[in-house]
């Protein structure tokens, strides 16, 4: 029995593993590659130079690999890469990259992408990310591992959001959010650290307390940012168990091109 519905249109040049399921009325373009165990629901369009890994589930009416919503795009063969075990719900749109960046949009593995999410051109997403309904990423946004974006969160182009960071419902993000930090509001401002998420991921009480001290140095000490970075380094040198996380926080701030939320 074929796993491709009789009404689906799969280009003969597309490369689909024999275990891939394709639902009714879906369209798969000629430059698409889909690995074993992935399920493409009904009424899905997968186009462009798109590679989809193993055991992904894509629900109805998603648009995967369409041209960037960028007027500079002139049809170049840019790419979209999707890893393994992702869930992509209804009406999600994920666009190809552009030649103005790295030529590729990337989605890692084990991500949960809820309905109506938009992931624009050249976005780079890590692993174990949750994007709640209607979250919108503008072009060139980078999300590190374990990020959680609340529903209707919007992220300005070129912003970075650090590992384990979280946004509240309707947050409007216009600057970088450091790792572990929770942000809320329009414009988004810091609102503590993502303690509950860290507990669920096995961080110890001592590590969470050290991260909280790092947060207070940045956001509650009234120190200029350069002095806060020096104080973070001193805290890092005192906290052997949490030093990698404090270093992660400090390095993110030092390399932030847009500046962090304050």
Swiss-Prot record:
One of its GO terms (biological process) is lipid A biosynthetic process. GO terms for molecular function: acyl-[acyl-carrier-protein]-UDP-N-acetylglucosamine O-acyltransferase activity. Pathway: Glycolipid biosynthesis; lipid IV(A) biosynthesis; lipid IV(A) from (3R)-3-hydroxytetradecanoyl-[acyl-carrier-protein] and UDP-N-acetyl-alpha-D-glucosamine: step 1/6. Its EC number is 2.3.1.129. Keywords: Acyltransferase, Cytoplasm, Lipid A biosynthesis, Lipid biosynthesis, Lipid metabolism, Repeat, Transferase. The keyword Nucleus does not apply. GO terms for cellular component: cytoplasm; membrane. SUPFAM superfamilies: Trimeric LpxA-like enzymes. It is an enzyme of class 2 (transferase). It comes from the Bacteria. NCBIfam families: lipid_A_lpxA (TIGR01852), PRK05289.1 (NF003657). Involved in the biosynthesis of lipid A, a phosphorylated glycolipid that anchors the lipopolysaccharide to the outer membrane of the cell. Belongs to the transferase hexapeptide repeat family. LpxA subfamily. Homotrimer. This is Acyl-[acyl-carrier-protein]--UDP-N-acetylglucosamine O-acyltransferase. It comes from Herminiimonas arsenicoxydans.
């Amino acid at each position: 029995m074929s796993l491709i519905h009789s009404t689906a249109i799969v280009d003969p040049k597309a490369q689909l593993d024999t275990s891939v399921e394709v639902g009714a009325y879906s369209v798969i373009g000629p430059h698409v590659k889909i690995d074993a165990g992935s399920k493409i629901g009904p009424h899905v369009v997968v186009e462009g130079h798109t590679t989809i890994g193993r055991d992904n589930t894509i629900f109805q009416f998603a648009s995967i690999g369409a041209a960037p919503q960028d007027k500079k795009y002139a049809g170049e063969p840019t790419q979209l890469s999707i890893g393994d075990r992702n869930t992509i719900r209804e009406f999600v749109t994920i666009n190809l990259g552009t030649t103005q960046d790295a030529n590729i949009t990337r989605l890692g593995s084990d991500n949960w992408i809820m309905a109506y999410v938009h992931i624009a051109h050249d976005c780079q997403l890590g692993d174990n990310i949750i994007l709640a309904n209607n979250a919108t990423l503008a072009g060139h946004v980078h999300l590190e591992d374990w990020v959680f974006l609340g529903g209707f969160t919007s992220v300005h182009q070129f912003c970075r959001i650090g590992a384990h960071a979280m946004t509240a419902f309707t947050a409007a993000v216009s600057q970088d959010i450091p790792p572990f930090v929770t942000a809320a509001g329009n414009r988004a401002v810091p609102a503590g650290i993502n303690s509950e998420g860290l507990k669920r991921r096995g961080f110890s009480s001592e590590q969470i307390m050290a991260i909280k001290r790092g947060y207070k140095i940045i956001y509650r000490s009234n120190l200029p940012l350069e002095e806060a970075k020096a104080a973070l380094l001193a805290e890092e040198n005192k906290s052997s168990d949490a030093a990698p996380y404090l270093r992660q926080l400090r390095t993110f701030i030092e390399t932030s091109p847009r500046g962090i939320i304050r």
